Amino acid sequence: MTKEKLLLIGAGGFGRMVAERAMLQYDCAFVDDGQAVGTEICGIPVVGGLANLPELRREYGLLVVGIGNNQLRAQVYEKAKALGFAFPNIVAPSAYVSPFAKIGCGCVVLQNACVHNGASVGNSVLLNAGTEIHCDAAVGDYALIYTNSVVRTGATVGSFARIGSNCTICNNATVSDGADIPDCTAVH
């Protein structure tokens, strides 16, 4: 069976983690301005840089942005959207997304992460390993939540927010748009 082709934007650390999950389902290629065309990373070829997206669109219809910088991820996502790319979600086999949760486009849900019943996650959100988004919690577009952090029931994480590792966003708490929450922080 032939796999669909998928462009992975970013071949850095996070991009490689995304690639490990994506290659289970897709025929992947990297786009990265810092790598030479033809280079292989994790067995995946680099086919160009961001300037090549218009020409790559002729061959690829799917794209996921694996860049940790929220602002840059948003810029690339919007540029690719304008070019007509579609954005599948990459969900690790050990992750759980409730059928009663809402998840946007182009999200990455890494191993052992959970998005529970009634939760909502915006577009191009990165949920690292062990992250939990509890019932009725909301995560805005382009947010990044690092390893083992928990967004509790009814809490809200704003767009472009960055939540460090091992954080707890307590029940009904709000993290504002663009906030940067350090590792091991509890937000009440």
Predicted region positions:
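Structural signal for interior beta-strand "rungs" in well-ordered beta-sheet cores
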Residues: N89-H188
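Fold-independent oxyanion-binding glycine-rich loops
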Residues: A11, D33-G34, G49-L50, I67, ...
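Short alpha-helical
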Residues: G13, Q71-L72, K102
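Structural motif
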Residues: C28-A29, V64, G106, S124
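Small/polar loops that bind or transfer phosphate-bearing groups
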Residues: G10, V64-G68, C135, N171
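Hydrophobic, well-ordered beta-alpha structural blocks that scaffold small-molecule cofactor pockets
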Residues: M1-R57, F160
